[in-house]
Amino acid sequence: MMEHTAHDRELPIRPGWDSVVNIAESRSCFSRFQSCFARPQKLVVVIGLCLLLCSPPPGAQGLPTAADWKTLSNELSGRLHQGVPLARPCFSTYNGQPAAADEEECAAIRHRYLDAEFRANQYAGFYFAQGDGCISNTTNQCQLDPENLGASPGSGLPCNQGLVSPWYVDVRSASDVQSAFRFARRTGTPISIKASGHDYVNRHTLPGSLGLWTRNLRNMTYHATFRPAGVSGAEPVQAITFGSGVNSNEAQAFAGRNNVTLVGPSSATIAIVGGWTLFGGHSVLSPTLGLGVDRVLQIELVTPDGALRICNRQLHADLFWALRGAGAGTYGVVLSMTVRVEPATPVTLALLSFTPTLENQAPFLDLLINNTPAWSAGGWGGPMTSSSLALVSLEQDEAAAAQSMRAAADYVRGENGTVTIEQFPTYSEFYARYIAVSESYVGIGALPTLRVLPKRLHDQPQGRAELLAFLSQRARNNQTPYLFMTPPARYSTPRDSTSMHPAWRNSYWLAGFQSSYAWNASVAERREAAREDQTSARDLTALAPEGAAYPNEASPWHRDWRREFWGDDNYARLEAVKARYDPAGLLRCWHCVGFDDAWVHADPAFECMGAFDGLV
């Protein structure tokens, strides 16, 4: 069965797992975790822009010529486009030069500026302020005031290129990617890869790169029985093959129509095949069904040598291992991914929340810490804070769920909070009710830092005391702890079956905090947000040195990031795979495998993040 998704209207929601604090109503809970130039014949008009902005990797010689770009444009038959900031039509200057504003187009942009679906459907649409604007430079951006979208921006606001790649390819097939890699090998131009635009660390764009945009690879195929290619004796399983542009809403709706359960993101517009899966992918279902990477059966991608490859545990097994944990933007351009699904089954939700005060958060944190091992044994998974929880189980009916949650529910009722225990016929129906329709917070600078905590902090009295003291102090200081019972605590898999840090297999919680800054924050305010983020990362590491950081939601400036993301042994293997498949380093991204720490200050492409490195 083959299906191509339509551009159905969906309410945008915040990505990832950012916050569930102060739930006013149940639907908002999950949200708080969480082409300008298509005609090649006109290429010469703006070729000067890319000659100025496109930069080869360190050590490469020269820049692409006008002839190089013309050749690429002809090969791509109109799918090479100029990358222009989303809000450019609202400004009368661009990159320091006069530029005509387009009031009609600007009005349309202002109308949907905070719409995550709208942003996901534009190459220049990035979810967070640091996605297209330089975090350490207040003028190297082109953004609107999200609090005042009723009028065009004032004449004093800048509109500059920011981090948006000056050229991008609207990828529709493997041949488009192969053409891009030929161009990159010939000219030394680096490649960046963007699917949905959900990225706290900006791995999906790179100044001076040729961007590859995969949003329009939206094929979906259900397999009643799937065997990976070339894997003799493989047990057939239910699976779905997703193109790399399919987002979470589209994927879950498709899974529901095929009566299966899919482990996926808890944000409507995250691409299910992108960085969410390739860097791990934690979900409310992960304690029972594993991480996103644990569900992957086969990957189709184009590597930088231009080869179209099928990867699984038999074919290109080294690459398959590396992709499942460290694969985003690093080893090739993923075109599609086949993931295992399970038969649809009922799911029960426990949703509890109360208004936090200085006095009532520590007792609730104590309840969470002490009940987590038993809840994990009961199949519960999901997000929590010092005043709320939203846990899901495939194993509890409503009566069993009420019994399991009794202590926490009694406490919440005592604080005049709300308690909801509700069962749904399928996970897809739960997703449609609570996640697909959740509200959105786009356009802010969001800097989460989360850490995988070892089980000893829950299983041992001293560990529980240390964890409670740490989180309670942060809560008293008005730093909301974000706690995710989403590591694969009950899911059994061989230790080295993926390139994920081994600490994930010995954990109940992924926990941490978030710093933020406004779109128009001063450099000093942005630096302070970065300092707070780095302080949280340092303190979490001190609390749980044997834990790990999650590449998707770690501090962008994490110390010892190779060890913290993957572990020393894994990283050595990952680097060897990188050298084998991308020896020229055409794919570069911040703190990805192969990143050279010297680039932090030596490479202009990384200067925006690099300016705030080492504040703590």
UniProtKB/Swiss-Prot annotation:
It is an enzyme of class 1 (oxidoreductase). Residues 160-344 form the FAD-binding PCMH-type domain. Its cofactor is FAD. Pfam families: BBE, FAD_binding_4. Its EC number is 1.-.-.-. InterPro entries: BBE, FAD-bd_PCMH, FAD-bd_PCMH-like_sf, FAD-bd_PCMH_sub2, FAD-linked_Oxidoreductases_BP, Oxid_FAD_bind_N. Belongs to the oxygen-dependent FAD-linked oxidoreductase family. This is FAD-linked oxidoreductase cheF. It comes from Chaetomium globosum (strain ATCC 6205 / CBS 148.51 / DSM 1962 / NBRC 6347 / NRRL 1970).
